[in-house]
Amino acid sequence: MIVNQALIELTKQVAVAVEEIKFSPNSTSNNSTPTNNKLKSSSSSISNCDSPSSKSKSNSSTSTPTSQPQTPSQLPQQAQQQAQQQHYSANSMNPYYAQQVLLQLQKPSTFVKHVHVVVKNTPFGITLRSKEPLQFNFQNYVIKATLLYDSDPPKMVDFIHNEPLQYVATVSEDGSEVCVDVKVGILSSQHQGSMFLVVLHISHCSAPTPSNSEPISTILTNIGNNSIHSLNVTNICVVSHPIRIVSKLDHVKKEGIPILKKRTFHEILTDKLKKLQKSQDSQSKWIKNLYQQHGAQYDMEPYNSTLHSQKTDSLCSSSTSTPSFNSTSSSSKNQSQSIKNEEEEDGGEDEEEEGGEDNDNESESSNTNSTQLIGKKSINKLPISTTTSSSNFNNLMVNNNINNNNNNNNNNHLIQNTTFSSTSHFQNSFNRVVEVYNLIPEYERVEVIRKMVQQLKSYDLEQLVSTFIDELKCGYESTIIS
């Protein structure tokens, strides 16, 4: 096997509880007698799986004697079985042990086996991550999972009709991670307390799919291919942590194993924010390097929404806006309300278009006077058309001129209150309509008005006229009251 850093690492394996069991290689395997070797080989072939309870008991310094009498021939066999349970042989065929040796870069004297307890028929996730996404991308590979006994040597889990293992693999968008949701089906009562391994076969799309009964030697070779410097990345195997299956969660509570707590919303949110901050820091470093390469100064000031809004407002106030003549509106009330809102927000934009001499920092009283003067100038400049539509439009503007003259006497009162009445809003809105009318060429005015009347429904047109008349009446009544 190639001893090097792994190309694919197992980053996460979900479980309801995790047990820790220490194991070490058998240092006395070379000095044992031939009879003991025969007993060891026979006991290893008989034992299909290891129970965590027996392993934890075998780790103790002294073993408790049994109450039943034992013959002398049975004592060495039991000692060999206990040694087999607490030690792996030097030439172990266990895939998990081989993977641990590869990850630790040397044969460990002792290592900890993390046994993950899962509930039967309940999915749990196994997350794999590629350390070199450019060299190895999960989107180009097919993943297959098989179930083995965690024994030495390992053994395939037999089944009659339905496979005991079901899985679904989900690859991330960039192909650097894959999450395999695994579910272990119903097993017989003989497997109670047994430990299993999930072997993930990762094969390239061009390579043939591995079989369910893949030889152990091939699995060990593919585990050795899991290296950054490996020349063969067509077939790679990754082994999960040992798994122990229980039928209910209450069994874990009875055994006294601490159950892993579910992550709270606060913990998940904090984790996500840390990941976002980490990615933003890395992006800032890349941007800073690009600025330095081009000899530009990098601004480290963070983004501020208030400053951004002030800059955009200043840009909008400095730029001139061209009013539009909306001829396809569906409701006259919505039209008048939108025009009033635009007049309140834009303030002095009308002065820049027609006056050209007023500044943006004038008071509201000067805005009112200027809009009224604009209305007078625009009305005086209006040409007289021979058509019926243009004459009606001119009569309406003459009436508005009369209202403007009446409202000039109330300017001082409006300045003192520093508020805009509905009449002034209507005047400003009407003046905007007049400005648009002046911008239209004389030979197109009649056609534009005709199209507007045709596009508007009869109900909308009546509502539009009634709204104008109501506004004119309100303005006339306000002048009488003042």
Swiss-Prot record:
Listed Acidic residues bias regions: 342-363
Entry superkingdom: Eukaryota
Cysteine disulfide links: none
GO cellular component, one term: nucleus
Chain residue ranges for the region called Disordered: 24-88, 307-376
GO molecular function: sequence-specific DNA binding
Biased composition (Low complexity): 24-86, 312-339
Biological processes annotated in GO: sorocarp stalk morphogenesis
Listed InterPro entries: CudA-like
Signal peptide location: none
Protein name according to UniProt: Uncharacterized protein DDB_G0270306
